[in-house]
Amino acid sequence: MKIFSNRFSVTLLISLIFNFEAAPAAELDKEHPSTAPQVRLASWWFDRHAEKIAEIEKSNNPKDERKIELLMVGDSITNNFDKKGPGEPVWKKYFTPLNALNLGFGGDRTNHVLWRLEHLPKIKPAPLAASLMIGTNNICWGSDKPKQAAEGIQEITRKLNAMYPKMKILVLGVFPRREQLDHPHRKQIIELNSYLPDLLKDIPNVSFMDIGSEFLDEKGFLSREMMPDTTHPSEKAHEIWAQAITPKLREMMGK
């Protein structure tokens, strides 16, 4: 598995570098970054992408009994459901029974998710549902304004719908970040989330939920018990997250 992963990563990296250098400047600048697919040139990122391809190919094998039925798409916050992350016990409890594939990659912005989706094999049969939570890195580590980040989320949702037209999609509002309600990141995330209902309303099979208040106290304060670094959920917060969305996902999946 590791041999496959490294070979895939090196080959793909070389190809992308040459293609990127050959692309006309006008093409590179024609879209805002939040809605234009963009690769990341980190070896671990390619290795993880290769692992996801291998998981899909295994699921697509007619002899394999486990079929992928749920996609969990996002950044490090979703990535932390994986092995050794604070959400691993929660994943096993709630999402392993739903045959979920973790497509969360640490540090990703909306444009990176778009690239990843474009470079995945088709899942057969199509997944029943997907959950999407992305955008915090657009605001806090990118140069996007809240509306631009929201448009990136809209573009990912359109992409998922185009890939699997019958799949139900649950888009989550970006989780709160930083302890205080008046922190600039908090305000930007609140603004970002305010755009999503209108941006998503015309995309088929899409539902929107904002569960951010579940992590806050009555005064809007984000405790380190919920998010120790004021960004990434603790195991307790992962449990709250899973409890909030699993009933809706099960409904979408007909389970």
Say what each PLM segment does.
Residues 1-73, 77-88, 92, 252-255:
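N-terminal secretory targeting modules
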Residues 34, 40-43, 82-86, 102-109, ...:
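Acidic/histidine-rich helix-loop elements
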Residues 72, 108, 112, 148-155, ...:
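Extracytoplasmic/secreted proteins, especially bacterial periplasmic and envelope-associated proteins
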Residues 79-90, 94-96, 110-154, 159, ...:
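Oxyanion-hole/transition-state-stabilizing segment in secreted/luminal serine hydrolases
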Residues 96, 165-166, 204:
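Proline-centered flexible-loop/turn and helix-kink motifs
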Residues 176-255:
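Catalytic His-Asp segment of secreted/periplasmic serine-dependent ester chemistry enzymes
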Residues 69-74, 99-104, 128-134, 138, ...:
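Structural recognition of the beta-strand scaffold that forms the well-ordered cores
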